[in-house]
Amino acid sequence: MKNVTIKSFSEEIKIPINKLIQKFADAGITKTNIDYVSLEEKKILLSYINSHHVNLPKNLSLQKKTKSKLNISSLNGKNKIVKIEVRKKKYLKCDSSLLFKDKIVKNNIDKTFCKKNIKDLNKTKKYVELSKNINEREINFEKKLIKEPILDKSKLKISKNLIKKNVKINKNLNIYKKNEFKQNLKKNKLNKKEKNKKIEINYKVKNKNENIFKKIKSNRLFGSETNFFNNNIDKKTNIRKKISSLTHTFNKPLKKIIKEITIGETISVFELSNKMAVKSHKVVSNMMKLGIKSSINEVIDQDIAQIIAEEMGHKVKLIKNNALEEEIIKNQNKNLYELKNRAPVVTIMGHVDHGKTSLLDYIRTTKVALKEKGGITQCIGAYYVKTKKGIITFIDTPGHAAFTEMRIRGSKITDIIVIVIAADDSIMPQTVEAINHAKIAKVPVIIAINKIDKITSNPEKVKKELIKHGIFLEEYGGDTQCLLISAKSGLGIDFLLDAILLQAEILELKAMHKGMASGTVIESRLEKGKGPVSTILIQEGRLHQGDVVLCGCEYGKIKAMQDSFKCKIKSVGPSIPVEILGLSGIPISGDKITVVKEEKKAREVAIYRQNKLRESKLRINKKIKIENVFSNLNLSTKKNINIVLKSDAHGSSQAISNALILLSNEEIKINIIYSGVGPITETDVALATSSNAIIIGFNVKPDFSNIKNTESIGLNIKCCSIIYEIVDFVKQKIYLSCNTKYNKKIIGILIVKNIFQLPKLGSIAGCIVKEGIVKKNSIAKILRNKSFVHESKIISLRRFKEDVNEVKSGTECGIVIKNFNDIKPLDIIEILELEELNKKI
């Protein structure tokens, strides 16, 4: 390519000469107005422009913030402070001509290179044409040789071979050049397309920016308030720029997907439909086909769920719901340690006021009986005593009839039962109950006849009565030990302890003293400042402070432990009662407690048990509702007394609720709508007000704030410390709520003589009193031909146009009967009076 002058080059790329010389100077080439520009210099200039090209911002924005506060008066009269922040933006647009000039220079240089490439292509075309002409000449020359006479055969062959070789070489060259030419053309086309696209995109973006800038300028005319909303415009434009096309990769399944469904012992219809990825109404319709009616939220059995899933073409895997529980039990390191002798667990049972707690006080050298309210034991207690011959654990049970469940619980966890019988009172109902509990539990019994130091005592009578109830003493050839004791003086108590230890030796009581502990909850309560406190009896292993335990529906890490003497301990072995702190809630008395390695597993099992308990309660309530639908329709007149019961311990609340339910009769039903452990709270008050219930507290006190609220509502709260008081209070409520029964008594007889009609009163019967008296507002029974016609109230009684309250026999009167005008002459009217009967509970 020939050298070009700077003037012609500047005209070609459309840039002033001065600026072009400056660009060359920046690139390191000194040029004047007269100098020429070579191809190499052009390349250097182009590379410099490409390397030093910087995208400058099109707009320069200056943001200004002004903050202020406004005092606004509200409806209440108080002033409100509102913070205001005004944001102003000012834009300075760069000269667009400068930005475009750089691009024009670049584009012009690219065009020159494109021209150069086109010239090169033209050259190659000429070269191809020349090669074609050469080939044609060679072919013509060959034809001439063939036409001429053959002089020398050898020369002719050589010339032919040479010609063939030349033709092949030329053909290969032509093919190679043609391919090269095609590739160059394609590349040029692609480059052109890409450049055109970029130019178009830049042009569109510029137009958009110019439009936005114009809008902002126009908004400035309306003042600074409009600038507050400019941020939103900028955000919207940015969002529009970032829009990208999304393509989903989901393919609709052509075949039915067969799933493997895990089904537990119970599953709801909604859960089953989710597992099968089917709409729940389809599952319900399939169940209807099988003749099973159910709703979406209803829980179905494992067998029904399996049949439905298999019918819908899915595989079923049956699992046990208590699989995790079984795994926890397996993980316990049982049978790894040696069995050693343990202390016997002795439960003391008997009738009320027969001296059970007094006996324990003498053994333990304490005064528990004096501190007990009402002089009776109302909660189960566990203590261990160190004697000269060994340790004995005693469980004290209440003797009242209401505490049957506590006695059953005591008989289940015990090794020996000591039945205390008062020598002056003989065998009573709870004594018989204790004997029956011992027989059911198959536990050996020791009879302790107490109060032998009294003058009225008769131990022989007690011994004879025991035979009637199947207890055969050693004196009469049986195997039951009988001892005469006095809890006050201590007479015979040492012999009783010896008898207990002897019986323990015969039983050969053994347990593991190491490993993961397990036991039973004797009692649980809620204490202020401590939270849930549980009294447990360890039966196996060793319990340490910090162990994770699972107890029924509750779990937790043991924070602290204390023995029956209120001393803090770090660990405890078998047959020793202990109080523990740290459970998540109050466990149910009688629940099994086990040590678990992982807290996560303990929590999972506890949640599963809670859900199972909730489901079972819902099922029971549903059955009760269905069974009582028709009975409630017939017995709509039956009254309900709703009670909210709160007690200090779980066992006490259970016993009291059972005792109160037994007070229900034909007219009144006792409903324990809620029973819990702990003080009376605001939620209890809210529940009682909504259900019109009585709040009963046993050994608990309500908050004073709640009492103030209840006074205004008129809510009834009764706090007692003795079970007798609660029973008497509820009995009184039943007596007051009972419907009074009346007996109808005939006090007078009338005979209708004449009928008068008045527009206001209706039919007036003119009668004569044959017997007795007639009273106003009394009931009139109308008989016609000795058959009943109507019975209603007398609303008006007159004698000679005067209103009177009563009329005696032998006199005439006029009466008006309520809602009855079909009175006829010679009708007989009986006057009735209601007589109240005595109430009975």
From Swiss-Prot:
Binding of GTP occurs at 350-357, 396-400, 450-453
Q: Which organism is it from?
A: Wigglesworthia glossinidia brevipalpis
* Broad class of where this protein is predominantly found: cytoplasm
Q: Which family, according to UniProt?
A: Belongs to the TRAFAC class translation factor GTPase superfamily. Classic translation factor GTPase family. IF-2 subfamily.
What keywords were assigned to this record? Cytoplasm, GTP-binding, Initiation factor, Nucleotide-binding, Protein biosynthesis
Cellular component annotations (GO), alphabetically ordered? cytosol
Q: Where is the tr-type G domain?
A: 341-508
For the region G2, what residue ranges are annotated?
375-379
Q: Do you know which InterPro entries this protein is assigned to? A: DNA-bd_dom_put_sf, EF-G-like_DII, IF2_assoc_dom_bac, IF2_II, IF2_N, P-loop_NTPase, Small_GTP-bd, T_Tr_GTP-bd_dom
> Where does this protein reside within or beyond the cell?
Cytoplasm
Where does the record place the region G3? 396-399
| Region called G1, residue ranges | 350-357
Write down what this protein is called.
Translation initiation factor IF-2
UniProt-annotated stretches for the region G5: 486-488
Region entry G4: which residue ranges? 450-453
Alphabetized PANTHER family for the sequence: TR-TYPE G DOMAIN-CONTAINING PROTEIN (PTHR43381:SF5), TRANSLATION INITIATION FACTOR IF-2-RELATED (PTHR43381)
Task: Give the Pfam families listed for this entry.
Answer: EF-G_D2, GTP_EFTU, IF-2, IF2_assoc, IF2_N
Q: Which GO terms describe its molecular function?
A: GTP binding; GTPase activity; translation initiation factor activity
**What is the recorded function of this protein according to its Swiss-Prot or TrEMBL entry?**
One of the essential components for the initiation of protein synthesis. Protects formylmethionyl-tRNA from spontaneous hydrolysis and promotes its binding to the 30S ribosomal subunits. Also involved in the hydrolysis of GTP during the formation of the 70S ribosomal complex.
